[in-house]
Amino acid sequence: MNDLINFEIVTPLGVIYQGEVKSVTLPGSEGEFGVLKGHAALVSSLKSGVIDIEKADLNHELIAIDAGHAKVDEDKICVLAKGAVWVCGSDESEIEKNLAQAKDLIKSMSSDNAALAATFSKLDNARMH
């Protein structure tokens, strides 16, 4: 049984991410929520934060976004975001650079200090794993 769901992130610059994934955790405007294949259809606003993508091989990728919207169907998730930064890289210096860009992107879009601290903590913890 295929338990993967199609996921894409689109910004004004184009498609940032596209692929089949096991699950996605999104920064909803009312709190984080997870989506698996077969999820009920919904449309949600997203706040600045981190999208946690669990791939088929159970590895995780993080993408920081500023505000946007998510459209969820039973077999597809589409995120439309104003901006996005992929928090990964081939070496430590590239990861550090992308992490700094992600923090700057989120900081520029949010004035909620508690939300900023939680998001930065998630980014820092992901870098250590």
UniProtKB/Swiss-Prot annotation:
It is a peripheral membrane protein. Its main location: membrane. Keywords: ATP synthesis, Cell inner membrane, Cell membrane, CF(1), Hydrogen ion transport, Ion transport, Membrane, Transport. GO terms for cellular component: plasma membrane; proton-transporting ATP synthase complex. PANTHER family: ATP SYNTHASE DELTA/EPSILON CHAIN, ATP SYNTHASE EPSILON CHAIN, CHLOROPLASTIC. F-type ATPases have 2 components, CF(1) - the catalytic core - and CF(0) - the membrane proton channel. CF(1) has five subunits: alpha(3), beta(3), gamma(1), delta(1), epsilon(1). CF(0) has three main subunits: a, b and c. This is ATP synthase epsilon chain. It comes from Campylobacter jejuni subsp. jejuni serotype O:2 (strain ATCC 700819 / NCTC 11168).
